[in-house]
């Protein structure tokens, strides 16, 4: 039975104000602080532009995040927000109520704004931390900080990003543009040079480089050296060269030379590598990584042998290998690596790595010692029912596991690789019993190989305890 919960007095007051634009704007000077965040969000969603922009000059908290509401950002909305910022910074003296120091325009960067949960936590956001000398932002305390993210697609910014950069450049005496996340998918050198005249590289914390050739990576190197506070780096499909003739003459030594010239990132915590010769990238790191992710990389035996001795990965929290062919390699070094990170590792993903029972046998002794693991993903590898039982006897001892993904047993397929769903249901029920005998599993899923036509998979999970077809499984 559903019970109707009447709106609170605060909700009624907010609804009343939003229905009367003039009343809402005139009431802002006396509006309780706790009403600002929710009222701002509702005004934004309902398109009350005048109310929205009138709130910015009297915003009573240090932070204002509009990025989470700008999923479909258009130029008109951006201009409306920036026009009110212009009004704010043009005033010789800010409103006594205005505490605004930072506006966040990033889509996926969540900045908590005080008052978002009624009055809880207000004091901690009402105080400004004193800037530390030589730290990012020092010397800019009198400027309004505008935080954003930028994305280059084939050498071009979208119209909103272009407008924002031009706007910030014209107001550099009063606005500090802070780009925390930068994505570059292909580039033109001229555009990058112009961008870095406005964007301060030392404030970039998250960098994604995709579909670039090595010569462009070499061109970016001076800017990379300025990224002294980089926390996350993604290298995706860094190709050797755009010139076919150069490609014929290119050897591995030249590739290694370029990559080895990458700067030392002293604060890097996360490295994501897709389709790149990655071992040389690890030599560019100073601070121990927390996340190491390889996707679609060619891994040699010498690469694998080197990993356990890499000093930068002994504090790993996440180790993810996806579509990395391991079938022709000896995995004892990977087992040695797991043993060395057993006290810190929380997430282990070995997905679609062409691993068989021999490969997993090399890892089981070390895997059994990784007691901090909360997530394991072994989907996409070929394992028999008998071996899956052996594997689950080991993972059953890992009491912290909260999310487990395993491949369906090979006995669930006929000789044409057609899934026999009744077998999947029977076998997976047996496998779950192994876990239940030792601990109470939280989330366990078994999945078949994805269909070559639709990309779907048959799934058996702990929640439903039945076999069903999922057209777009999140892991496939």
Swiss-Prot record:
Record's keyword terms, sorted: Leucine-rich repeat, Repeat
TM stretches of this protein: none
SUPFAM superfamilies in UniProt: RNI-like
Repeat keyword on record: yes
Tissue expression remark: Expressed in ovary, specifically in oocytes. Detected in follicles with two layers of granulosa cells, and are present in early as well as large antral follicles.
GO biological process, one term: negative regulation of DNA-templated transcription
Signal peptide stretch: none
The LRR repeat ranges on this chain: 97-121, 176-200, 201-226, 227-264, 265-285, 286-317, 342-369, 370-394
Source domain of life: Eukaryota
UniProt keyword Metal-binding present: no
Family to which the UniProt record says this protein belongs: Belongs to the PRAME family.
Descriptive protein name: Oogenesin-2
Annotated source species: Mus musculus
Taxonomic lineage from the root: Eukaryota, Metazoa, Chordata, Craniata, Vertebrata
